[in-house]
């Protein structure tokens, strides 16, 4: 992640005019959940297009197998141990750890330290308008997006999951409810587009679109559920869908129709934003970055996806838990279809 941010900070220096920056972060998305990375079940044409339009990094890793430490690293460019956030915020750590392990996990920080300079603060001081939408989960009141360099915050607060689910009403103190049934990823994309469309400033923008998707609870619309139910049935249901790996069963196949619908909904939201950039003629001067915070949930929680051939998934320090997609489109710098 530190190397990625080094590239990230250097890119604006390569152009006479400061480019806009759109950073898209998925939640609990395993690298094998994407069509362009080999999934034959999930459909992600808009995310695939980002990978194909720019540079695809083939050895991308997150700094942790769970969300809060990884997100803190993305914001700061520092490793979790240096920041003091080494587990998801809210997890029992230190003397609160109730298992019979001989070694206790370290005490975990509850917020991103105020003394740390974030990427949003650095860009804001460099003349950028800054915007955040979606999942935060690296601090509550006094340590939210607004306290770390973001001028606008739509939906980011202490919670690591969408308290009201993926359809309005959202029960989110930082996001006004839309019409009943409005899909959360689509709403976050629309909020991002509204920010991008603002005409009252000549400043470049830094928009951080941080989806709650595809974190649990796994939910989708009836139409998308039916689409992926038929797809799973047509492909033939696997006889051996789970295998034990140490203490937990691990999902072996990608055939969950609810998760398939969630993936498509998030991908459609990505498409709303990237197509909006093109509509406004901003795609030629906007750096687009896509990644995820940790691996897919193949064991525990909803057992929603499979990370094979990578071992493990979210919460485990094997490849499935930390291997990530990293895609960057930087007009005039990256070449379409290139890899590194």
Model-predicted segments: where are they?
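Anion (oxyanion) recognition and catalysis
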Residues: 51, 124
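Hydrophobic h-region of N-terminal signal peptides that target proteins for export
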Residues: 6-16
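His/Cys-centered metal/cofactor-coordination and adjacent catalytic loops
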Residues: 81-119, 171
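Short, well-structured beta-strand/strand-turn elements
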Residues: 127-138
């Amino acid at each position: 992640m530190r190397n990625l941010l080094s590239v990230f900070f250097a890119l604006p220096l390569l152009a006479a005019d400061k480019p806009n920056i759109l950073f898209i972060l998925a939640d609990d998305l395993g690298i094998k959940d994407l069509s362009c990375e080999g999934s034959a079940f999930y459909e992600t044409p808009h995310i695939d297009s980002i990978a194909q339009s720019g540079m695809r990094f083939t050895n991308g890793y997150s700094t942790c197998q769970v969300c809060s430490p990884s997100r803190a690293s993305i914001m700061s460019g520092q490793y979790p141990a240096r920041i003091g956030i080494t587990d998801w915020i809210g997890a029992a750590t230190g003397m609160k750890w109730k298992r019979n392990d001989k070694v206790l996990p370290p005490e975990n920080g509850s917020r991103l330290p105020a003394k740390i300079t974030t990427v949003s603060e650095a860009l804001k001081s460099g003349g950028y308008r800054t915007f955040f939408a979606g999942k935060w989960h690296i601090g509550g009141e006094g340590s939210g997006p607004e306290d770390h360099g973001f001028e606008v915050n739509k939906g980011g607060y202490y919670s690591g999951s969408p308290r009201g689910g993926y359809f309005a009403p959202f029960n989110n103190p930082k996001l006004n409810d839309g019409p009943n049934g409005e899909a959360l990823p689509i709403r976050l994309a629309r909020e991002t587009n509204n920010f991008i469309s603002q005409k009252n400033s000549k400043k470049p923008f830094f928009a951080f679109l941080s989806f709650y998707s595809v974190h649990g609870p796994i939910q989708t619309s009836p139409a998308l559920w039916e689409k992926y139910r038929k797809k799973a049935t047509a492909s033939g249901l696997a006889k051996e869908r789970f295998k034990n790996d140490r203490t937990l069963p691990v999902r072996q196949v990608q055939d969950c129709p609810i998760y398939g619908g969630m993936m498509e909904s998030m991908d459609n939201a990505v498409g709303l934003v990237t197509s909006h950039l093109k509509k406004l003629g901003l795609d030629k001067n906007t750096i687009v970055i896509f990644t995820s915070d940790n691996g897919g949930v193949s064991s525990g929680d909803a057992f929603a996806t499979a990370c094979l051939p990578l071992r493990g998934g979210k919460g485990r320090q094997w490849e499935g838990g930390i291997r990530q997609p990293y895609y960057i489109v930087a007009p005039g710098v990256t070449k379409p279809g290139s890899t590194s």
